[in-house]
Amino acid sequence: MTTEIRASASPGEVRVALLHDGTLTDYAIWRPGAPDGVGDIHRGHVLKSVHAMAGAFVAIDGAEGFLPDSEGAKGLTEGTPVIVRVTRAAQGGKGPRLSARIGAEPPDIDVSGGVALLRRGPDPITRFVTAWPDATLTTDSQVLAARLRGLSVRIDVVADAFDDALATEVDALSEMMVELPGGARIAIYPTPALVAIDVDSGGTVAGGRDRLGHHRALNQAVIPALARQIRLRNLSGAIVVDLAGMPVRRRAALAPALTAALAEDPLRPRFLGFTGLGLAEILRSRVHPPLHEVLSGPHATGLAALRAIAANLGTDPRRMPALRAAPSIVTALRRDKVALDDLATRAGQALVLRADPDMREGNWRMESRDG
């Protein structure tokens, strides 16, 4: 099996695809100016111990995280300094999850002093290279390639890390409807409590005496694609799936296929069984934010605008436009100095940002710098 890591860089963002034998297997977005923080080591202090939650809230650099008793909070009192590692990124409206179990303390970690970020955790490329050391790494950024020279992997620099087919497949991950070969489709509905997934035959199963058999075959064929979409989109926490067509009592026959498909996922999601309504229950660990959260909000929109501007530049920095956008987008970009500096380096000049209170949330446009 050949394994490839493809890293497509744009200002402030690197889209990272993992492919096995040419098939997209895993996907992540890395924002160097605003990483999700998983694996970061912080020097923090206890804000408040909450016995009802069996843990404590800890102030860390730029955030407030939760340290469970089982991960080292037991016995800590308000104001106590503590070295912690982020084990789960902030997501779903909740702050990061922490652990005081950081393993052997690195020699350069300074345990004295106030709240501070002491060390960054691994980025997605490093994680993929660590898990698949025989992979090849391809990127379209000389700057990124130089930054990654310390990794024990061959790095190739090309004009476009994502070909048209891969770019199309990655772009489709932002859609909540997945069209499958043969006409079936998967609809994904994230909610604050869980992720609901509906499998629809799309009219591919005709009536007749063996309608049940056709639905069973359809679901058997869909299940690997379902597990793949869960992994690519990093859907996590409680996941319930309504499979197509089969009576509730007959769905148990699909349990082995679900278990086998989920076994390929490094996070080892668990198939818990079927509810009384016939919904398949899956539990997948929350670590990094799900893709639909990563792709939403003013920062994500602003970085998409920078990607479009960089693509529009080509090799001629004289084509550098100004960006007019909703104020929330401009504010988010101004906070990401890495992204703005990246674009300025490419263009040889800084981007002019114009906050327009008359523009709706999420809206932006390129315009003349002289306008």
Place the predicted regions along the sequence by residue:
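Extended acidic low-complexity intrinsically disordered segments
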Residues: 51, 63-65, 146, 327-329, ...
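Beta-strand/loop nucleic-acid-binding surfaces
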Residues: 28-33, 57, 62-75
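Conserved glycine-centered short motifs in functionally critical loops
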Residues: 54-58, 90-100, 182-370
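Short small-residue beta-strand/loop micro-motif enriched in glycine and branched aliphatics
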Residues: 26, 65-68, 203-209
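Short, acidic/hydrophobic/Gly-rich beta-strand patch recurrent on exposed beta strands
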Residues: 17-18, 56-61, 66-68, 85, ...
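Extended, charged alpha/beta regions that create polyanion-binding interfaces
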Residues: 1-36, 40-43, 47, 81, ...
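Short, structured coil segments at secondary-structure junctions
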Residues: 61-62, 151, 347
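Alpha-helical multi-pass transmembrane bundles of energy-transducing inner-membrane proteins
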Residues: 65-78, 89, 93, 243-244
